[in-house]
Regions:
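N-terminal segment immediately downstream of the Sec signal-peptide cleavage site
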Residues: 25-112, 181, 186-223
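Intrinsic low-complexity/disordered segments
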Residues: 4, 23-25
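Predominantly extracellular/secreted and cell-surface proteins with exposed
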Residues: 79-160
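Bacterial N-terminal signal peptides
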Residues: 10-19
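Bacterial N-terminal signal peptides that target proteins for export
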Residues: 1-10
Length: 223
């Protein structure tokens, strides 16, 4: 974890003191999801992306290796009936407290130039009953709120980057003092993500447009 990522560390401090709070009130000066000209920052000093699964985790415990073990799949996989997940592990520097995922934003992101925010860390999800282990890395959120990542299946890459989810009901904009850029939205399963996962399981387990998570992305603006 980069210690100069003040926004991410502040989020962790708030979490430790008060539990998971609703960060959505931070976005007060939003713009349409097409991102009006001049609102996307050129440079940032870090920040965080918070992913809150839209479903309830039925049981949650901590395994010896630090993984969170539960009977329901979590981000970015929605629960799959008949396919219990045994371990969901946040890959450092991402963390998974209280069933919510926090990813630090790479402070070297240049959203106005590259069109996205790079996230640090990843997630692994294991389905031992099916002999399936999935890892999701190299996450990024584009300036419209769509989510991308690379997927590894049982240690083998299933290809290049794919779009995991489409943005839905996105509210995007700068804070009134222009020091923060926020994306607040709901993520829904993309066609290519559903197709890729269904091939891995050999069955239709994901449906396009399924809700995955609510997202609060807060980036600290330099200029």
């Amino acid at each position: 974890m980069k210690l100069n990522n003040v926004r991410f560390l502040s989020a962790l401090t708030a979490l430790a003191l008060f539990g998971v709070s609703d960060l959505r009130a931070q976005s007060q000066n939003t713009v349409p999801a097409n991102v009006a000209g001049g609102t996307v920052p050129a440079n940032i000093a870090g920040g965080f992306a918070k992913f809150t699964p839209v479903f309830q985790i039925s049981s949650l415990a901590k395994a010896a290796n630090g993984a969170m073990t539960n009977t329901t799949a979590t981000f970015p996989m929605p629960p799959i009936a008949g396919h219990p997940v045994v371990a969901v592990l946040a890959l450092s520097p991402a963390i998974f407290p209280q069933g919510i995922f926090f990813f630090p934003i790479d402070p070297q992101s240049q959203p106005a130039k590259a069109g996205d925010f790079a996230l640090e860390g990843g997630v692994s999800v294991s389905y031992p009953q099916d002999g399936i282990a999935l890892s999701f890395t190299d996450f990024r959120v584009d300036i419209l709120g769509n989510l991308f990542a690379r997927i590894t299946f049982n240690g083998q890459s299933i290809g290049g980057e794919i779009q995991l989810a489409n943005a839905s009901a996105a509210r995007i904009g700068l804070s009134p003092d222009k020091t923060q850029f926020t994306i607040i939205e709901t993520l829904r399963v993309s066609n290519i993500f559903a197709e890729s996962i269904n091939k891995i399981f050999g069955a239709t387990v994901l449906t396009p447009n399924q809700q995955i998570a609510n997202v609060d992305l807060v980036a600290d603006v330099i200029d």
